[in-house]
């Protein structure tokens, strides 16, 4: 009986946590640069100059600064 009660309590706690609680542990970095023709460039500059030491990747044309 105690085991069933503990299992029910565990399920209730996990249900209260919900799926969104995992998102709190994932940090989303702002995208301050973008990949244009394979070159990482800053979004805010008018001339879109290249960023020194930027880490670009081609997944949905996103990139982020190191």
Curated annotation (Swiss-Prot):
It is found in: Secreted. This is Defensin-like peptide 1. The keyword ATP-binding does not apply. Keywords: Disulfide bond, Secreted, Signal, Toxin. One of its GO terms (molecular function) is toxin activity. Coiled coil: none annotated. It comes from Ornithorhynchus anatinus (Duckbill platypus). Does not show antimicrobial, myotoxic, hemolytic and cell-promoting activities. Residues 1-24 form the signal peptide. Disulfide bonds join 33-63, 40-56, 48-64. Pfam families: Defensin_3.
